[in-house]
Amino acid sequence: MLPNLNRIPQVEQYVLDYLDDLQCQHFEGDIATNYADRLSLATDNSVYQQLPQAILFPKTVADIVRITKLANLPEYQSISFTPRGGGTGTNGQSINNNIIVDLSRHMTAILELNVKERWVRVQAGVVKDQLNQFLKPHGLFFAPELSTSNRATLGGMINTDASGQGSLQYGKTSNHVLALRAVLINGEILDTSAVNSVDVLENIDALELSESSKKLHQTIAQHCKEKRAAIIKDLPQLNRFLTGYDLKNVFNEDESEFNLTRILTGSEGSLAFICEAKLNLLLIPQYRTLINIKYRSFDAALRNAPFMVKANALSVETVDSKVLNLAKQDIIWHSVNELLTEDEKDPILGLNIVEFAGNNKEKIDRQVTALCRLLDEKIEHNQDHIIGYQVCSDLPSIERIYAMRKKAVGLLGNAKGAAKPIPFVEDTCVPPENLADYISEFRALLDQHNLQYGMFGHVDAGVLHVRPALDLCDKEQVKLFKQISDEVAELTIKYGGLLWGEHGKGVRSHYGEKFFTPELWHELRYIKTLFDPNNRLNPGKICTPLDSKDELYSILSPMRADKDRQIPIQIRDEFKGAMNCNGNGLCFNFDEHSIMCPSMKVSKNRVFSPKGRAAMVREWLRLMANENVSPEQLDFRKTEIKLTALVKRLSNTVQKWRGNYDFSHEVKAAMDTCLACKACASQCPIKIDVPSFRAKFFHFYHSRYLRPTKDHIVANLEIAAPYMAKQAKFFNYFTKLKVTQTLVEKTLGMTDLPLLSEPSLQQQLVEIHYQGKSLEELESLSAVEKNDILFIVQDPYTSYYDAKVIRDFVMLTQKLGFKPILLPFKPNGKAMHIKGFLKRFSKTAQNQAEFLNRMAKLGIPLVGVDPAIVLSYRDEYKEALQEKRGDFHVLTAHEWLKQRLQNADLQEKLKNIAKTDRTLGWYLFPHCTESTFMPNSPKEWQEIFGRFGQQLNVEKVGCCGMAGVFGHEVQNQKMSREIYDVSWHKKLHGKDPHFCLATGYSCRSQVKRYEHVVLKHPVQALLEVLK
């Protein structure tokens, strides 16, 4: 039995007092002090980890004013704050050990848009892609491009002065910030924008500013004016100019304007809370073309890049073979393999993605033609190691290429082995003309340590992302981490560059003095003193105030690995999904129609995300290791939950009801909101697979605490369903009674229970004169006779609750000339796995696997109708049974149809089968698990419908919110409905439900209960076409 985990770091009393007083000040936002909430924001996208005391989620600028004004009381002077946005920073910018102020949950409003003048005013928590989605109908966009654009907030972009692809033309974020509204540490609101330099320097009273604002404007303007010559002379001359703090660009080129905004952009929250921003917008280019140039080596791609820049391309992105090979193993490659074809004998080892864009089509065509002509000449003469190139000008193809490039960062984290590519020297920047030589020396530095690494980036701007693979759980490699960091810092100085060309400084700030002269470093500290004299805003980053004894963070600041190292290696291996999470945050994707992660999308609570759940489990494992729990105790295959422990479990459960704390309860709360949709198992670049370690957690959690009755009912549904189906009328009568529904809700916590099929599947098969065959008859058939037979593998949901789907699939296959055989129903066990009955699941899976292996030996295809169940044979069965699983293979309905429809005889037969003479427009709503594990399935369904003379439109939808039993649990009703409304309801609205199709039983059930319509399975639509 596992121990009670109650020894956790407590919140300091002075912080609790502050939070109590803040609530009395009518703070409207959220306050979080739970250990789970603190853990979820203890990390960002870096290797670092610091546990905050508390998290504040303000709703308004007024809330931030309340936060800061209260903090100025004498008793709260020791409290420090760190603003936080999307948490995508790679250098620890948004973590600290005091109070985090997270603006991403509530401050997400787009406040004002002026299309004519091309500007927009937003709150700091707006996500970049969210803004561009809003702007797209107006033909406008916010330019700076990031690989994390679907979860990075504009406040975070401003604070790090982010930039990315296309920066030669579009510049950095600061080039597009027209004005800011910020809150100072003293609680005053600071508005900044471009003002007349003369007014600032000589007539400050002419400006409508507060007294403190006047002082900031005038003092900084005077200092930057006095130091202007030194600033221009001593700072690196780069497209990715030095920010944090941007001394150079506070004045425009002719020094007629002064803009304090440029000091705040890139300040990483160390000067003020940036709350709102007025942003410059650009016209969306009407015409875009990519030329994807393939090379035999990365060095060739790198050295060929300046040639592309001279062709006046908008951007040149370079990717090495390490990243490309990881992409080929990911779901993303299915979307780009036709755009990046290769010969196995001549593989792509380097790639340049060259983009031309603008509103003059003829000009772009000329540029593309000219470059292609030069490339053809080089290929003809075997120059520059170019394999070939492919051109794409359609927007969907362009977006797919860039989606692959954006995912490259996360893909590196999925490298095999304990050493993982990590960010710490990944955004160095040197003058583009020095890049090839610089990278050559950089690679030599890494090669001398025998390190693996991936490279990709913006070679046109002299920025290349490099992530060396290190195992920071190994203390020797931590030393190497420091050594490499120091050496690369010196290398960038040697080549006239910067250690931070794109992602800000963060904990790397302690290298800052190396890149500034003593005179200019003093100016930075002076600016910090003006804004934050007591070093209370993101302390340890950028610089410290003058006369401060505080120090900057070290590159060896507390790391995630410091905690992970405490967990035995065997346990890390058993829970490697949780351990491998690198914080990339793709599960925070704002897109409401993306599959990952449904609970995070509607709750806005990062605990309820794959990253949050991974953090919970890692800490759970660490705390148990500290309680001397052995690896054997955390191997469900080696543990038994004995009946003799029932009394103890009952006692523990009573203590839980009485409010006794156990961190395991917080972990369980995070796991209870997981829908087990499996999106994270494929959509996450690291493929962390929360449902897998969630099931293990439930198994162990319930070795200490009793299970709720509903878990036992769910786990035994497959056993009971066949018996209940024989008396469907009887059970349905009682299920429909209001008193029964109320009783079930109150006592079992279940609601909206589905009705058994009437008539039953067996009765419906009798009606269509279906006849099966015995095993003896099947074994006596010849190979030719077996060719027309298929085995239908039943699942409990369609067979007993949606039997018409099975009947119609039988009829469809018969009409196509096949002889379907319905195999005897046997439990699959998926529900047991979801609820953590792992011992029972393994036994059930073994029985089903033995049966299906026996059937597979007959050489007859096995076909299932519900994709979630079919895919469990490939996933959960493989994990649980390993080599004992056998080699049986169950096809989904569309896989079987696709295979059969490739037969010329069947194609000819299909032409002669009587079917509707109309081409109907159907809409497919794919099951989320099917979409993630089988990314080509929607396209394959389209091909199948095309064979039937029909048009199938695929709707991009997220999770429906049902997910098996999740949507039937009373505690999940609010979340289930919100998940449904955010995607499915919107996509179904306005469409004729008769032509809307859903492959998943759960999805059809969810639509039925909220829309009161019944969607068809695609096989039913095909049958209708044949009728």
Curated annotation (Swiss-Prot):
Transmembrane segments: none annotated. Residues 665-696 form the 4Fe-4S ferredoxin-type domain. [4Fe-4S] cluster binds at C674, C677, C680, C684. Its cofactor is [4Fe-4S] cluster; FAD. Keywords: 4Fe-4S, FAD, Flavoprotein, Iron, Iron-sulfur, Metal-binding, Oxidoreductase. GO terms for biological process: lactate catabolic process. In the N-terminal section; belongs to the FAD-binding oxidoreductase/transferase type 4 family. This is D-2-hydroxyglutarate dehydrogenase. It comes from Haemophilus influenzae (strain ATCC 51907 / DSM 11121 / KW20 / Rd).
